[in-house]
Amino acid sequence: MTIERVLSHKRAICYSGFRDGQSPDTGVFPSKEEIASDLRLLQADWEALRLYACDTHAERVLAVIEEFGFDFKVMLGAYIGAEISNPNCPWGGEHADDVLLENKRRNQDEMERAIALANRYNNIIDVVSAGNEATVDWTDHLV
């Protein structure tokens, strides 16, 4: 069986429901009601959503899809931080050792959340992408 048969083509969009004053960096995430409002608008034109991290936002999006019965598939991203400094990164890929060590711990937590969410929402999540930001040699997110 080929991957094309397993994963059919879908109209997809990257989704981030953050509004003014909301940010994963500050821990202020869109509410389920805000997410549901967005998904009502998106459902007319899109079949799949791309999420970039396994954080509270992703958990809420998946819960809303399930609770409201939205017909979306999700490509879940696991956001990976640098575990290795990269002096070739044009915008500064050098990190202190303690930062790299903390990133390694966070990366492990992120991967565990990705697995847990993929298992919990296996009827919604059809792809997990880990470390998209770490796949090029010029990144500040080397692993």
PLM feature spans:
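Flexible, active-site-proximal loop/turn residues at the rims of small-molecule/cofactor binding pockets
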Residues: 19, 55, 134
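Conserved residues at the C-terminal ends of beta-strands
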Residues: 16, 52, 131
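Acidic/glycine-enriched edge-of-secondary-structure segments
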Residues: 18-26, 45-47, 96-104
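Boundary/entry segment of secreted carbohydrate-active catalytic domains
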Residues: 1-37, 41
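Substrate-binding cleft of extracellular glycoside hydrolase catalytic domains
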Residues: 61-143
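Catalytic domains of carbohydrate-active enzymes, especially glycoside hydrolases
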Residues: 32-57
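Conserved, mostly hydrophobic/aromatic
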Residues: 13, 49, 128
